[in-house]
């Protein structure tokens, strides 16, 4: 589903575009009216996807609030759509948790963990499903298998033995996508997010076919700041390759960003280069010598938050190096002390990373590639038609640019170790998706991954599979590998280790 330009994606993009237009164009006098008009602009005279225009507009209204960085309205009392808007109309507005929220009016209350016999059942003589059920929940009704839901324990044995694959396992897509089991049910049977478990990776959001889960955005605040002429510098994550069209070159992408009003553009891969060298040094001095049994990378915030939440004894094993986003932002602020910094990337959880008190002074805005597309649309900018800008002087290495794909972080550190510490044996592990990350952390906890550098990526495929991406994984992976292979130099200089950014 993620490879397709679904109506869910189209609606989200329309919302982002409308919000960005208000930030760019609306006056203080017209802003409230313009915001209130968005649900009517999105849903005109007929409902396309739900039973009435009123429900569709109600859902669109909640999307508008989240896109402006506001929380959903309570269901038990009347709150105006624009309540809180004036307080959010400032450049310094940060996200207020929770970041990920279920829109109740959009949720279809999908059935969860249910086995059901489909019309594919042939009513065969063998009846393996009936024989294998440990609770006698299956009987023959009108010549077909039937599952008594009151007796079923959801073990799945019937499905496993059916020769016709006639038994369906119904799961909530959002629940199936969540690697930390944070999706639960409310009293209405609708999905709800246990915020104590959630690590804000956004996989539930991109897996819901009803678009019932959404995150908050700073697109309104950013577009308003750009309109005001604030000096804003963009730091772009290396996963930007292929996100705005297969034929869009890095130079055209930079040109499109300049047209939006960004005064300069830096690659986040620069910060990755710094981290790569520092992590290699840390591994050589601490892990290879046995002072630390293993070292966990920290560039993926959902991965590091999960490690802290679910494996608190491992906190000291999480790398303390600056993440690429923060390291790059500090380079920018060092060179442009009066500028604001926006991180543009594929990641939803970077929004929470930027909320940390230790990061707030470094990163002023975080938007995803999906939200950036809304900014481009609001300004009628098409990256593929923009002029080619030459590569900036602060170009990153192949190692840093490769951070965007699963295994790229560990691979870059491994290559630095082999180059700069050739006598040290290197043990590398990497995991992608939170479910796999939990498995590898369990192995580390059991002492089965000693003297090891462990890379974790919450999103399947790494950053290029993030919740805020526009393009499918397969084509992006191919394009990114081509870009990395053509990048020079291959490795960062050891001198970066001495760069003072703290």
Regions from the language model: what does each represent?
Residues 89-118, 135:
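N-terminal [4Fe-4S]-dependent radical SAM core
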Residues 110-131, 160:
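Glycine-rich adenosyl-nucleotide cofactor-binding module
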Residues 108-116, 139-144, 185, 203, ...:
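Gly-rich Lys/Arg/Thr-decorated short loops/hinges at beta-loop-alpha junctions or inter-strand turns
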Residues 1-75, 215-502:
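Iron-sulfur-associated redox domains of electron-transfer enzymes in respiratory
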Residues 74-83, 93-96:
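Acidic, serine/threonine-rich, charge-biased low-complexity segments
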Residues 126-149, 157-194, 199, 203-218, ...:
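Iron-sulfur cluster-binding cysteine motifs and their immediate structural context
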């Amino acid at each position: 589903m993620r490879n397709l330009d679904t109506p869910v994606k189209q609606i989200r993009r329309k919302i982002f575009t409308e919000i960005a237009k208000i930030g760019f164009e609306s006056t203080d006098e017209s802003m409230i009216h313009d915001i209130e008009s968005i649900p009517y602009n999105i849903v005109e005279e007929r409902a396309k996807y739900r039973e009435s225009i009123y429900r569709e507009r109600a859902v669109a209204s909640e999307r508008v609030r989240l896109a402006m960085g506001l929380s959903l309205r309570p269901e038990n009392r009347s709150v105006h759509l624009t309540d809180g808007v004036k307080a959010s109309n400032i450049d310094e507005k940060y996200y207020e948790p929770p970041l990920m929220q279920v829109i109740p009016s959009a949720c279809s209350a999908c059935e969860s963990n249910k086995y059901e016999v489909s019309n594919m059942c042939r009513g065969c003589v063998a009846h393996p499903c009936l024989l294998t059920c440990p609770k006698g929940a299956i009987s023959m009704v009108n010549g077909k298998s039937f599952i008594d839901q009151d007796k079923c324990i959801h073990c799945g044995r019937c499905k496993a033995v059916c020769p016709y694959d006639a038994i369906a396992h119904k799961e909530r897509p959002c629940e199936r996508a969540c690697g930390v089991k944070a999706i639960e049910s409310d009293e209405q049977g609708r999905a709800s997010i246990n915020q104590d478990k959630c690590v804000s990776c956004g996989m539930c959001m991109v897996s819901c076919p009803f678009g019932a889960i959404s995150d908050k955005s700073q697109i309104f605040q950013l577009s308003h700041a750009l309109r005001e002429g604030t000096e804003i510098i963009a730091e772009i994550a290396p996963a930007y390759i292929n996100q705005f069209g297969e034929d869009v070159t890095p130079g055209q992408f930079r040109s499109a960003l300049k047209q939006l009003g960004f005064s300069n553009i830096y690659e986040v891969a620069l910060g990755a280069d710094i981290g790569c060298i520092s992590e290699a040094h840390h591994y050589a001095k601490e892990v290879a010598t046995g002072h630390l049994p293993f070292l966990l990378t920290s560039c993926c915030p959902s991965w590091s938050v999960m490690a802290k939440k679910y494996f608190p004894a491992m906190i000291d094993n999480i790398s303390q190096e600056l993440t690429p986003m923060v390291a790059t932002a500090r380079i920018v602020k060092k060179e442009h002390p009066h500028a604001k910094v926006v991180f543009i990337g594929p990641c939803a959880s970077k929004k929470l990373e930027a909320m940390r008190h230790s990061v707030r002074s470094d990163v002023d805005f975080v938007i995803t590639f999906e939200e950036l597309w809304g900014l481009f649309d609001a300004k009628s900018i098409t990256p593929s038609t923009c002029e080619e800008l030459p590569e900036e002087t602060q170009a990153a290495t192949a190692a840093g640019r490769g951070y965007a794909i699963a295994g790229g972080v560990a691979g870059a550190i491994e290559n630095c170790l082999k180059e700069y510490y050739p006598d040290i044996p290197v043990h590398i592990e990497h995991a992608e998706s939170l479910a796999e990350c939990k498995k590898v952390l369990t192995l580390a906890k059991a002492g089965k991954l000693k003297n090891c550098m462990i890379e974790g990526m919450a999103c399947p495929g790494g950053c290029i599979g993030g919740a805020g991406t526009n393009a499918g994984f397969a084509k992006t992976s191919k394009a990114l590998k081509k870009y990395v292979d053509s990048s020079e130099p291959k490795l960062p200089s050891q001198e970066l280790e001495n760069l003072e950014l703290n």
